[in-house]
Regions:
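Cytosolic regulatory regions of ion transport systems
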Residues: 1-152
């Protein structure tokens, strides 16, 4: 485990688990909103990229209690679990909830069938990117038709 000593000073922050496509978008939004956060990432290459960009990060597996504790989960406001693996997200959700009962847990589900399991395991919010993308495309299509045509 490698991390920045300043992470130990964080409180009321968010822990972002995963720095893939979705994790990058989350980090961008947190930076814009000036929300304190730390990223947990298993990839050495992505971890180094985070450090070079000055992003607080820990190189390690978010399924590990020790890694979550080193990220300050007991002092955190919430966690955003956006790894592209439903079973890993489920495992992290269970561990995170066991370490902080008040933690806001937002997690990703690649498949709708995992959403209920994630909620039952402690997730407060479950995001299904492909489903949300479908809703957005559907709205775009509907907006190209007159309102009365939709109200059939």
């Amino acid at each position: 485990m490698i991390h920045d000593a300043n992470i130990e000073k964080l409180g009321d922050h968010f822990i972002v688990c995963g720095y893939g496509h979705m994790g990058r978008a989350v980090v961008d939004q947190l930076n814009r909103a000036e929300v304190p956060f730390v990223v947990l990432e298993t990839s050495e290459e992505l971890y180094r990229e985070l450090l070079e960009a000055g992003v607080p990060a820990i190189h390690g597996d978010a399924k590990s209690r020790e890694i979550l504790l080193s990220a300050g989960i007991e002092r955190a406001r919430g966690t955003c679990i956006v790894i592209d693996d439903d079973l890993e997200n489920l495992s992290i959700t269970i561990t995170a909830r066991s370490l902080n009962a008040k933690l806001k847990i937002i997690t990703r589900a690649g498949q709708r069938c995992y959403a209920d399991s994630l909620r039952t395991s402690g997730a407060d919010e479950v995001v299904i990117p492909e489903y949300l993308g479908g809703l957005t495309v559907g709205r775009m299509i509907r907006s190209s038709y007159p309102t009365q045509a939709i109200l059939v």
